[in-house]
């Protein structure tokens, strides 16, 4: 079946086929090699891209900006403090304004409905840099990183997500594994597993791709022989301190420790994290949590010993955000 990614949105990967996702991964690999070898060709000269950030970011902003500059495009960074978005102007109107000035729009914020609305009214490609529900650019980077760190073909790679699986990382890792025919395992307390509607959708994708999906609260079942362990933060800034205790107590068995890595039975298992990670109490929020919960002074979702070990490939993930985002922009705009 022929496909065309020209002028395509990237909103969640729900509407991307297995072949389209694999094409983006192959393009990202090629662009990465070209950058490393100094042979990269600029294909986005004259393009202008708006970067809307309702949520702050380090990796997403830097990845989009560097990827755009590498390809000859110009970007404009827009945040709530420097625009009328959400204050005096609706997202619908913002989309119709920016769509007349820019060739594409990136959005990083809260509701998936917001990025969908942008895509509906902008008239230009819209790329989801993160919403509460999905994180598609991170998924492309994660799969590229797994391919680079495993000699198995894609359909034989196994990975598990540990922790609060109701968030964008749990949702997105379930989705992309189902799309690509991988062995994907979601491991969380029953109260923190993905929504049934998403699970049903991903099971349908898995039937088409021959993916293996395991959703469980049984840690030993989920991690057995796995190639990669993913996790994400358990708490977010702005959440009331009193709500942390119940969730932390629920998630403590799912903390990524050396013992948990060993329980996989795979001496080559790798650790992955979308970052930022609370692996010690050196940050402001890490200190705040450690004061309230002293048992977490050496890390929350992952402890320092794992994070600083050779098993950690999270910084390769972070770099691959740039290469995969570049692939998305080139495929859509070049």
UniProtKB/Swiss-Prot annotation:
Subcellular location(s) per record: Cytoplasm
Residues annotated to bind L-ornithine: 168, 232, 236-237
A GO cellular component entry from the record: cytoplasm
EC number: 2.1.3.3
Any single biological process term in GO: L-arginine biosynthetic process
GO molecular function: amino acid binding; ornithine carbamoyltransferase activity
InterPro entries, alphabetized: Asp/Orn_carbamoyltranf_P-bd (IPR006132), Asp/Orn_carbamoylTrfase (IPR006130), Asp/Orn_carbamoylTrfase_sf (IPR036901), Asp_carbamoyltransf_Asp/Orn-bd (IPR006131), Orn/put_carbamltrans (IPR002292), OTCase_ArgI (IPR024904)
Residues that hold carbamoyl phosphate according to the record: 57-60, 84, 108, 135-138, 274-275, 321
Enzyme's top EC category: transferase
SUPFAM superfamilies tied to this protein: Aspartate/ornithine carbamoyltransferase
Principal localisation: cytoplasm
Cleaved signal peptide residues: none
Family: Belongs to the aspartate/ornithine carbamoyltransferase superfamily. OTCase family.
Name this protein carries in UniProt: Ornithine carbamoyltransferase
């Amino acid at each position: 079946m022929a496909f065309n990614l020209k002028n395509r949105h990237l909103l969640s990967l729900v509407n991307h086929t297995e072949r389209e996702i694999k094409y983006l991964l192959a393009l990202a690999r090629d662009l990465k090699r070209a950058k490393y070898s100094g042979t990269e060709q600029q294909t986005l000269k004259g393009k202008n891209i708006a970067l809307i950030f309702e949520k702050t970011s380090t990796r997403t902003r830097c990845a989009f900006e560097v990827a755009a500059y590498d390809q000859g495009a110009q970007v404009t960074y827009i945040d709530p403090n420097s625009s009328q978005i959400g204050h005096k102007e609706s997202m619908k109107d913002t989309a119709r304004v920016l769509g007349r000035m820019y060739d594409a729009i990136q959005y990083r914020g809260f509701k998936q409905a917001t990025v969908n609305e942008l895509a509906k009214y902008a008239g230009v490609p819209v790329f989801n840099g993160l919403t509460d529900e999905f994180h598609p650019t991170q998924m492309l980077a994660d799969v590229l990183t797994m391919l680079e760190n495993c000699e198995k073909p894609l359909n034989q790679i196994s990975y598990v997500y540990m922790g609060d699986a109701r968030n964008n990382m749990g949702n997105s890792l379930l989705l992309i594994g189902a799309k690509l025919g991988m062995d994907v395992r979601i491991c969380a307390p029953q109260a923190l597993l993905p929504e049934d509607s998403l699970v049903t959708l991903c099971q349908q994708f898995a039937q088409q791709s021959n993916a293996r999906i395991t959703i469980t609260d049984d840690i030993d079942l989920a991690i057995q022989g796995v190639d990669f362990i993913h996790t994400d933060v358990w708490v977010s800034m702005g959440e009331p301190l009193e709500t942390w205790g119940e969730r932390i107590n629920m998630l403590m068995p799912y903390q990524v420790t050396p013992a948990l890595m060993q329980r996989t039975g795979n001496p080559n298992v790798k650790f992955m994290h979308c970052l930022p990670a609370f692996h010690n109490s050196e940050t402001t929020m890490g200190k705040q949590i450690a004061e309230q919960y002293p048992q977490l002074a050496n890390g929350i979702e992952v402890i320092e010993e794992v994070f600083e070990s050779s098993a950690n490939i999270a910084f390769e993930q972070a770099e691959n955000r740039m290469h995969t985002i570049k692939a998305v922009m080139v495929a859509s705009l070049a």
